[in-house]
Amino acid sequence: MLNSNWINYAKPFAMLLLMVGLRITAVNAQTGNSFAYNDTAFLLNGKPFQMISGEIHYPRVPKEAWRHRMKMAKAMGINTIGTYVFWNVHEPQKGKYDFSGNNDIAAFVKIAQEEGLWVVLRPSPYVCAEWEFGGYPYWLQNEKGLQVRSRETKYIQAYRQYIMQIGKQLATLQIHKGGNIILVQVENEYGSYSNDKEYLELNRKMFVEAGFDGTLYTCDPAKDVDKGHLPGLFPAVNGLDKPSQMKSLVRKYNNGKGPFFIAEWYPAWFDWWGEKHHTVPAENYSGKLDTVLAAGISINMYMFHGGTTRGFMNGANYYDSSGYEPQISSYDYDAPLDEAGNATPKFWQFRNAISKNLPAGTVLPDVPSAKKVISIPAITLKKQVSIFDVLPKSKSSSNPLTFEALNQAYGYVLYRTTLNGGKAGILKIKELRDYGIVMINGKRVGILDRRLRQDSLFLKLPAGKITIDILVENLGRVNFGPHLLKNLKGITQSVLFNGNELKGWQMFSLPFEKLDGINFTATAKKSDAPVLKHGEFTLEETGDTYLDMSKWGKGCVWINGHNLGRYWEIGPQQTIYVPAEWLKKGKNELIVFELIHTDKTLLDAVTQPELNKLRK
């Protein structure tokens, strides 16, 4: 979601810095570049510097498109890129690290430097960000007694090992070492969660141990700065865009001094399934942006470009009042750049506001030309395979096992048991996480949805021995709030029929990390169970496009091996963005996993997104 933290570390040299009027200085001996701040301003190479930062998350944008998005940022007047670093992306399994391809965070930072942009790095390790488990890897929950965002020993040990790996990738890219990282954030809106200053100090020490010895900071919403700020570190503030109030708050926690940084300035908001798409007119914010910049306040725009939360990496909110709210795959955010990287009205109005506040004579770069959008004829998915025909070897247990117990992070698990039929009653799944399709002898008989607080289903069982299958989907672990510590997935307790607990379960893991080796067959036969559909289409040219999923039910889509994300007929998102970078001239492969409307075979492509169509 939205979190950022400003921290400054200069203990060994504190007295010296104070003598020269600076509280933190990072100098690169080779190039002479330095970043610092005094009582009123940030200083870049000794001169006042106003950060105009835009947030872009590298996993949400194809690697091939990173440079384009940065060129767009610079053309709007952005001089800095902010990004979280996502633990579950880089350590998907304990001790196994991945910095390749779209996870190459060092390449992302270096491209920003090549484009003349500074970087605000936010390794936290908690990111919120509408991201699965707030960025934490699922396997942390398998460590007995581990408690995230605390001084608990197992958590700190895992966290330290991870942040050391991040340091190996990025510490040398700080400004005083020849790079372009000017700020590094420690933790993330911690005041919204707790107030343990010793834990925050542990964070600071680990960052320094990992090589992040430049300018560190913390960030919190205005109401939580007292709890989330670590004395001695710079307090940035999220969401407060009234200059007098913002400056007063920073001075309160920074010994009466500046400078001033809105670490998350929100041009709109995110979306979740079953609720309308959030938009805010550009004119509602362009004036606010002008006011903030005119007051000399630095900002990080959350988001400048949201992109797409692909695969199964969306998070969820959970509140006792509203319940479970999984977020959609589009992270459009009604940002200055839309999901595909195109300029929106906000882009142009924000560009004007920024231009007014730049030094006299400054000329912004030309805006890159509009991206090509292509129309694809309707695609027929001629082949399919039932979920029952792709089941792997099962794991048996008396009681249902969670995803975590199966060492599975995301996707689906099929739970199977048998019982004697010839009776009717209530099937109850205690603590279903999150969406379950119930099948009797291979035929769907009902759906249970955690969003709707559904856990029970009336069943009339046929005579004889029957098989009950329950396909459970992880719709995204909670990424914000106290329920962060209650994030197991699957059937997390028990299954009852007429009050009697069902035993003797088989679990089939379906993480769908790769779809290699699946044998699709050409058939018109309707499946009573969820199906994987396969089709091909040929292109003479590539460009961005959108798949119209409004006639389908629920599932996810792969193009040429890339998991593009989820779709769900309830909306508001009805289209899936297909980036040009993942299409190719000639033959392209399309796979759809459809849970509900298994008879569908035709898929349309459109040239415009549909992100605001609800279907209750």
Predicted ranges, named:
Residues 51-62, 87-104, 141-161, 185-196, ...:
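The substrate-binding groove and active-site-proximal loops of carbohydrate-active enzymes
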Residues 424-439, 468, 537-560, 567-568, ...:
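Aromatic-lined ligand-binding clefts that engage carbohydrates, nucleic acids, or primary amines
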Residues 209-210, 241-338, 342-345, 349, ...:
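Catalytic-core region of carbohydrate-active enzymes that cleave or remodel glycosidic bonds
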Residues 66-132, 204-209:
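Aromatic-lined substrate-binding rim segments of carbohydrate-active enzymes
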Residues 104-121, 144-181:
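An active-site-proximal structural segment forming one wall of the substrate-binding cleft
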Residues 28-80, 110, 542:
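N-terminal carbohydrate-binding accessory modules
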Residues 155-230:
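Active-site neighborhood of glycoside hydrolase catalytic domains
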Residues 94-103, 114, 124-150, 200, ...:
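Aromatic- and acidic-residue-enriched segments that line the glycan-binding/catalytic groove
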